[in-house]
């Protein structure tokens, strides 16, 4: 299990990356070393991994510049994305409020359009990915794959402290964002308005979990976790011990699906 990583810690690992189409992005690393950070640090490129790649958490925050577009593409690792601020479009769908997107490996998605505000979103993976494979240039590499494409969007409910959010919760309110599937894929928002223990799915029911604090604060394994803090839990580890602070917390759990031969 990784340690809790705060937003402030991640900002110390912030690097600029200009996409091939000229879109400016800024990448803040939370967990692991992603391909942008490797380039920024002058590290050698990594070889491709067979699929599924070995379990290796890679998590970072993307700030996409105003009035920009990231073209359609796919990755070679399973991932979640959490849109947390800004406006634009994901494909043809408006980015409205907090949104979770999941895309399994080799599933093309996007484009991501940012309007004049720009957009911010977390990218969370459980394995190494060498970088985007742009479409349609890399369409040929998808031929012959028998696995069906798999991705989707889930809206995150209003949070504690928001105008439409819960004002008093007895115990813990669990709200489904991505319905649970047989292989363990799921995402659930847990909210409290006071001190309370929070229990999520058993880690070995999937292939790794991320927990992201969206509002308030809590203790995760006796480590302080404030807004925009996160932690990764491996499937062979015990469930994290989470206790909401006295003002409550809104914390999002995202679990990756199991994979054959992993």
Question: Which functions belong to the PLM regions below?
Answer:
Residues 94-95, 105-134, 183, 224-226, ...:
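Ligand-binding loop in jelly-roll beta-barrel domains
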Residues 99, 228-229:
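Structural motif
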Residues 50-52, 69-75, 91-93, 112-114, ...:
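Short histidine-centered beta-strand/loop micro-motifs
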Residues 47-89, 93-98:
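The feature marks the first
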